[in-house]
């Protein structure tokens, strides 16, 4: 008795595990895992509020994450060839609801999106994520290694999903009833890849701000650099001037939707005249631009054409130009663009941005390694198996043009010969006015797409819940509710974002903060 008492004092965690079936199951789980091509690195019980250990995470991916719920965390390597592997994590929550979800990546991948894992686990999803096959937001690992490139192009999410589902079935006696996907940016592209190439992987796919026209998006970065020039050019446009240009564009376009709220609801209905900003001799160069600079702005805000005259990529969103300045208008080629051409297109570390031409863009598109372009409109297999695709894109996105998401929607409509009402049965796309890249922005951009965009003050604004309602209950979203939050986290106002091809018009009688004063037309 005395010995037992001493042991209970010395080993409180062990005693707790002995009385906690969930923790015991987690502690014993590693012995049950025997999956082909999987090497388990760790299995650990993590209590709600506990910091997630970053000991085995690549240094460039380390982030501060606290578990939202009690969970069992599995870290592992998944071999995809004799020259490539994925770092992956599975988070298996105590409050499991019988649902599985896979998460995607961002940028040039390289990191497990642990915030997305945490978000999904919070709502009872068994969740998995990979690093896309390499460490960090860089293309250098693609040099002379096509297998690593294949992981990034299409393989990582699918392989992670296969393993994640197996782990879910091993850990929970009931297995899983439904499977989902959640991703944005590169994660959006990966979501579309899954729909197009692996239609049976998920019952519901959430794909936001998708980089699906990936190759041409990469080349667009070079086009924008060429359009705006080097930093030492006499007509170079500084970040401060881009802010002035942005303010003028918003001034000209804000009221097109009927409300003076500082937000351009749909950039397609905006046609700003940049020449209004040309200095007239009585203004200084800090609040106006030269004619040569106006010409540069017009080039930068125009469609990007390939050498054969076809549109490779649509123009930048009006309203996003100020935030684009720090990425595309710096006087240097966008880093991800330069890396892609150096390590993939030319596979030559000596290649530099000065060598880029329109023929380079043509070559990149012709290569399309492992069909990384997720632009195939034939998604009939996903439709026919009952899958649901929910897509969103911020109209203020400074990195990926939201027009590209519209173009893909139209491509699907044409390929399937389907009217919007028919596409609505399985594919719904929402433009989110005032949203930047995957979030933030000046509008009601908090739609519950992940941590930092969900608030318990409005629990109904939750993309995962919306998708579950559609897949499991047949309740398709007619609009996408979004919140504009104040600095203290309180809700300033809510807006009902329209389902494409409709767009929002302010019709009153309330002001722009009243969600019922807007009409989708």
Curated annotation (Swiss-Prot):
Catalytic activity reads:
feruloyl-polysaccharide + H2O = ferulate + polysaccharide
Q: In this UniProt entry, which cysteines form S-S bonds?
A: 26-72, 61-111, 184-438, 253-270, 279-288, 498-520
> Cellular component terms, GO, for this chain's entry?
extracellular region
Amino-acid positions noted as binding Ca(2+) in the UniProt annotation, renumbered to this chain: 254, 257, 259, 261, 263
- EC nos: 3.1.1.73
Induction entry: By caffeic acid, p-coumaric acid and to a lesser extent by ferulic acid. Repressed by simple sugars, probably via the carbon catabolite repressor protein CreA.
Q: Name one Pfam family in it.
A: Tannase
Q: Which GO terms describe its biological process?
A: cell wall macromolecule catabolic process; pectin catabolic process; xylan catabolic process
List locations, semicolon-separated.
Secreted
One GO MF term on file is: feruloyl esterase activity
Q: Which domain of life is it from?
A: Eukaryota
In which family does this protein belong, per the annotation? Belongs to the tannase family.
Q: What function does this protein fulfil?
A: Involved in degradation of plant cell walls. Hydrolyzes of the feruloyl-arabinose ester bond in arabinoxylans as well as the feruloyl-galactose and feruloyl-arabinose ester bonds in pectin.
**Quaternary structure (record):** Homodimer.
Question: What name does this protein carry?
Answer: Feruloyl esterase B
This chain's source organism reads Aspergillus niger
List the taxonomic lineage: Eukaryota, Fungi, Dikarya, Ascomycota, Pezizomycotina
- Identify the gene encoding this protein: faeB
